[in-house]
Amino acid sequence: MRKLILKAAVLLSASAAFFLPEVPAQDAPKRDYPIQPVPFTAVHVNDAFWAPRMEINRRVSIPTAFEQCERTGRIENFVRAAMVLEHKDLQDKHAPGYPFDDTDPYKVIEGASYALSVHPDPVLDAYLDALIAKIAAAQEPDGYLYTTRTIDPEHPHEWSGTERWVNEEVLSHELYNLGHLYEAAVAHYQATGKRTLLDVALKSADLLVATFGPGRKTIYPGHQIVEMGLVKLYRVTGRTPYLALAQFMLDSRHGGRSYNQADLPVIEQTEGEGHAVRATYMYSGMADVAAMTGDKNYSKAIDAIWENVVGKKMYVTGGIGAVGAIEGFGPDYDLPNMSAYNETCASVGSAFWNQRLFLLHGDAKYVDILERTLYNGLISGVSLDGEKYFYPNPLESNGQHQRSPWFGVACCPGNITRFLPSLPGYVYAQQGDSLYVNLFLSNKATVTLEGGRKVAIEQETKYPWSGDIRLTVSPETAGRFTLKVRIPGWARGQAMPGDLYEFAETRASEPVSLQVDKHTVPLNLDHGYATVTREWKPGETVDLHLPMPVRRVTANAKVAADRGRVALQRGPIVFCAEWVDSPDQHVRNVVLPASRTLKADFAPSLLNGVEVIRGEADAYRYERNGKLAHTTEAFTAIPYYAWANRGAGQMEVWLPTTESGAHPTPFPTLASQSKVTVSGQTEAANGTRSPHMLADQEEPGSSADASSQYNWWPKKGSTEWAQYDFGGERRISSVDVYWFVERQGGVRLPAGWRVLYLDGAEWKPVEAGGPYGLALDQYNHVAFQPVKTQAVRLEITLQKDKSAGVSEWKVQ
């Protein structure tokens, strides 16, 4: 993309028009959120934590995401669709990889537009002009925009359906694509003043208004977000049919599946269920409609859902969506760590949702969750250099998790690129004559309060490493107004709202203190905010001190995976132990007794500068004779968001406090010391698949235990293999295979399998002494005539419409 935008700059005018012309509006919005965020363009971040990340996002993540969209044909799909509309001969009419591939350029355009708003860049501006022209050319005359159908109306992607919209409630993603288009269009218009993409969006939205609604087609989006996009178009234009359609689509949800929150009417839903990204986008859309219409049924429903999610289904990192097979919520308190999915997109969606709930209710608890997610489960989704991404964000790893530059389903990179540049818009908010301070980071901002009073505010802090924050408040003229400063729950002894997590230490910590012009004032807490109402003069200071001791966190006893374990937290940051910092490069064998003292110190040269927690822990291992041994060794924990930036290996957030909870390092076996390869070995679609999991000596709990396994998804009906190379000739006589299956996915038992050994350069079947078993929840043992060989293979025949997987494969 770096070369592409330079080429575009030559072809197009490099001058950027940073103005905001009026869009003709039918009606101005009459209602809105009672609290309004201060626009991100009014907040200039200059701290050492977020400013570098935002700059890396601008300089690295956005350009490389555009490069990936070019390389993988996502942008070419628009060119191909335009050729069809122009009646040109298109030889290649193959369907895109997925029908939602159109959204990836849209999301990166949105992020690039936010970046342009605060950092004018004529080269990037010109590149967007060229890209938007391609998108506009792919739009059909009536406004329909969906490249896979336009490229080949007779044979679109298999998920798309034979006609427009007929498969929308299941898999086509037609409306999902448009939701991201609308959000990108509004962002681009507001950043540049140009209507090029906005006109495409409005033409599309007018088609939706003409197609769906009372007396027309009834439909609910299979993957929610168009509701949020329609509300954004309503905000810009004031055209009430867009808002009405967003509400109609929400109200049409019932009689479907819980997977996409369509089993019950939205106002009757009370629990987080199904696909987590779909869910948070829907809850955000419900909040928007509630704010714009005043319908309290929506807010009542999402309030109940929030209590369920935060109280029973959220990880200590703020991540949501425990179940990988559905990328979504599991049962209450079912929060496994190694198989935790916690999709990066779900964390972004959670941030959207919690921000909207704060704007509705003005309670700091929503910002507490936003902050927890932001500093832990969200930014863990991108590497420190801005070039690689996590799709899932587990809380435990045996080395199978690695960030990837891109994915087949590439929703997460685009979501990161659009969220980070908008972060300054989450710092402050305003209601009447009250100014809310929600997030702590060094910045300068100007806020307009009720009556047009302008207040300049400056923050100076080393947060999140220090809890000392100085605010300098400078109204244009002296006057009376209210400053509301969030006091985080973690600083008030509350690990998280509700009883899902709590601090292990019951002793009182150092109190929070607040000073105005160096005079201590009472906190006067109101819904989690220290409230100071007074006559303010320019240049007055507010000093907030939030103590940051190292805290041990415990989980509700109903969370089976975390019993007898603690997580470590300091300030808003959750920590983890990572293999690199362990003397033996293992951390899952570590026990951290409650009696051990822990201290924090700043390591400026580590991971771009981080606070680390140090102490001593006990490390357990099995010796050759099978006896359990342990040693006391130095212990180091790093911020969770920074893990997997130094290579693949073990990681653990929840640390056992006694020997019974440890995973002692096993004594090596023939399989564990072998080189492991598999057929069709490529990077997993979500960056979590590694062949070495077949021989990691991790005993599965059941065949459905997804924590440590390898599968061949999305291969179906083919013959696949896994291979151990011994590095020399070995005598073997049996294998044990533990099959992995998904309860709700496409990985099932194979149709059959056999064992082959390498004889010279030829693979030969062994002479098995019994059947090749396909039993679940146990090892399938096959003994055979002993052979001497340098390598052995499992050859697996997949069922016609299914894939297969293996949790563990032993060789004797």
Label each residue range with its predicted role:
Residues A8-F18:
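Bacterial N-terminal signal peptides
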Residues L124-T147, N297-V310:
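Carboxylate/His-rich catalytic cores and anion/metal-binding grooves
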